[in-house]
């Protein structure tokens, strides 16, 4: 019974090997994240007599190369939440923080939790890949928003309000009607210098070429508004270049966002819980994969309260002696990305109001009681997660063991 504790960092790790009753098999030593370094670690672990289990923290992306290579060598590997390791066995007045001490602490954790350790597997790699894509998706969403605001700021000086003319959603390739319109009619003079009939014909041909729906009344409305607008920048080659560059940057970010959205859905469809999650109200091909990416493997949660605590939407507790606080904010100690996705799901439920959905009924009830926005949204997220946990766990338990 050998517990291998690995404190992972960028490019290298500290390893300690222990047995029960504090027996040190190998004092903390350093390995590099290279082929030779990992192979030497595998040989050392295999040379130690008895069963060995390896535990490491899933910190950032650093641990993945070790977890993957050690699993490929048919060793038992378990990647744990750093918070669980940090809170383990803190019974000393001294505060010691070093890589060597952390490696020993992880090894002691492995011994204490030996029977409950969950083995890292190929499905974990798929989930990690999905989570990485989701974080990239979030990054490019922020980038797209910044590029959109930048373009609108420039257009306010050449064609004020053009971004409000169309509200159609983005296409699968990321293109949007208002952006394509602004790329062609980048200055108000591009519209009002033509006669009404000439603009209608030009706009109709543009819609046909770009495969957008044409409306004559909309064309007349656009032309009428253009007559009243006052631009700041003149209609010249430099202004056109500035706008074209801003449009290209926004289109590039939009294309990346939509391709990631599609790729995430394809990857998420390989997970066993995919059909159950996609059947839930408020969840679609965009939010569903995001939920699965951030929640991960449901089987690692022992009960419903564990998954709500992981998301940070569980009610806080503040009691001491005879004092008991009645209204306590939620813990917010979990994943902020998961809370954001849950709030988006709640927003979809409020907008679509499916009357037969228990989460929407709960949200509607709390709103009717006059609860503040964040109170009923957080309470709804809590209820949604509990239902998610129950349905997914029940479905997974019904599947044949592989």
Where are these regions (language model features)?
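A detector of single, family-specific signature residues
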Residues: 1-402
């Amino acid at each position: 019974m050998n517990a291998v504790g690995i404190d992972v960092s960028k490019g290298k790790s500290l390893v300690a090997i222990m047995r029960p009753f504090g027996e040190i098999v190998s004092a903390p030593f350093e390995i590099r994240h290279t082929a030779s370094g990992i192979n030497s670690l595998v040989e050392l672990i295999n040379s130690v007599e008895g069963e060995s289990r390896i535990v490491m923290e899933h910190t950032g992306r650093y641990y993945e190369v070790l977890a993957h290579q050690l699993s490929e060598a048919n060793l038992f590997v378990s990647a744990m939440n750093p918070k669980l390791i940090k809170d383990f066995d803190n019974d000393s007045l001294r505060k010691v923080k070093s890589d060597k001490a952390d490696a020993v602490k992880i090894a002691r954790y492995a011994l204490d939790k030996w029977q409950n350790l969950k083995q890292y597997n190929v499905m974990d790699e798929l989930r990690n890949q999905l989570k990485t894509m989701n974080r990239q998706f979030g990054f490019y969403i922020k980038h797209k928003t910044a590029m959109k605001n930048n373009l609108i700021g420039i257009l306010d000086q050449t064609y004020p309000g053009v971004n409000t003319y169309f509200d159609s959603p983005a296409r699968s390739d990321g293109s949007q009607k208002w952006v394509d319109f602004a790329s062609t009619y980048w200055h108000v003079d591009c519209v009002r210098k033509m006669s009404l009939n000439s603009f209608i014909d030009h706009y109709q041909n543009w819609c046909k070429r770009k495969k957008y729906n044409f409306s004559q009344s909309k064309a007349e409305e656009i032309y009428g508004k253009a007559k009243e607008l006052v631009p700041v920048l003149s209609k010249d080659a430099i202004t056109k270049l500035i706008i074209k560059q801003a449009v290209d940057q926004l289109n590039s970010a939009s294309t990346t966002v939509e391709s990631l959205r599609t790729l995430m859905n394809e990857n998420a469809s390989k997970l066993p819980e995919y059909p159950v999650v996609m059947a839930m109200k408020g969840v679609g091909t965009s939010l569903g994969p995001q939920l699965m990416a951030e929640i991960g493997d449901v089987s690692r949660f022992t009960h419903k309260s564990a998954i709500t605590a992981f998301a940070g939407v569980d009610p806080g507790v503040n009691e001491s002696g005879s004092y008991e606080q009645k209204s306590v904010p939620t813990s917010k100690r979990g994943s902020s990305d998961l809370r954001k996705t849950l709030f988006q799901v709640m927003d979809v439920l409020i907008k679509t109001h499916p009357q037969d959905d228990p989460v929407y009924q709960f949200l509607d009830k709390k709103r009717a009681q006059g609860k503040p926005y964040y109170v009923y949204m957080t309470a709804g997220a809590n209820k949604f997660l509990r239902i998610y946990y129950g349905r997914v766990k029940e479905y997974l338990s019904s599947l044949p063991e592989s």
